[in-house]
């Protein structure tokens, strides 16, 4: 097997592992985020402007992310129990633009993945060309993106309050991540 091909998954795993407990809370310096629109896997359009007054939770993932397999079902169950399921978006933004992957996620891979972890397609969005990722990154939602390039750590959860301001960014979730999300909702 080509050793070069083995480097990328190892590098990705190490970045995720080493930075998995990094948390940035922006509660004091709330960044205003721009509005956005994105389609879910069922074809329905989500427009953030129609959700003003309600918090939004965005969870960025990719299909080969081991921590995502644990975080996503737990977050889905938590948001369901809180009655906030309509404000939860799982966003796959693992695209060629990151330049660390030869084989980006596809809609088919995402559907297989979410079937495996039992997440309904209405909650899952495919940021195929990285538009939402870029908007959020340029707005400061991913502090590590400036430090290490365009890479966003996975899973990454951001919470936007009802005024459209960023109140929490968890890059690489870890133990107690649900408590941190609940605290700012």
Predicted region positions:
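Hydrophobic beta-strand anchors of alpha/beta hydrolase catalytic cores
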Residues: 57-58, 88, 157
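Conserved redox-active cysteine motifs that mediate thiol-disulfide chemistry
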Residues: 60-77
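N-terminal "domain-start" segment that seeds a small globular fold
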Residues: 24-48
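Active-site acidic short loop of glycosyltransferases
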Residues: 52-54, 119-121
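Positively charged n-region of N-terminal signal peptides that target proteins for export
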Residues: 1-8
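Thiol/disulfide oxidoreductase modules built on the thioredoxin-like
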Residues: 119, 127-182
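Bacterial N-terminal signal peptides
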Residues: 9-20
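Structural microenvironment flanking redox-active thiols in thiol-disulfide oxidoreductases
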Residues: 72-119, 125, 131-135
């Amino acid at each position: 097997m080509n050793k070069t091909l083995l480097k990328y998954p190892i590098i990705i795993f190490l970045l995720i592992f080493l930075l998995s407990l990094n948390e940035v809370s922006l509660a004091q310096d709330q960044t205003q985020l721009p509005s956005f629109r994105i389609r879910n896997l069922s074809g329905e359009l989500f427009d953030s402007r129609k959700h003003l007054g309600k918090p939004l939770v965005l969870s960025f993932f990719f299909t080969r992310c081991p921590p995502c397999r644990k975080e996503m079902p737990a977050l889905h169950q938590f948001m369901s129990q809180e009655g906030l399921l309509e404000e939860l978006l799982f966003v796959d933004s693992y695209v060629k633009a990151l330049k660390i992957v030869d084989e980006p996620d596809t809609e088919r891979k995402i559907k297989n993945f979410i079937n495996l972890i039992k997440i309904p397609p209405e909650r899952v969005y495919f940021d195929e060309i990285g538009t939402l990722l870029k908007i959020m990154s340029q707005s400061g939602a991913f502090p590590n993106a400036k430090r290490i390039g365009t890479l966003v750590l996975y899973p990454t959860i951001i919470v936007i309050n009802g005024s459209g301001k960023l109140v929490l960014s968890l890059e690489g979730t870890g133990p107690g991540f649900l408590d941190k999300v609940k605290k700012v909702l």
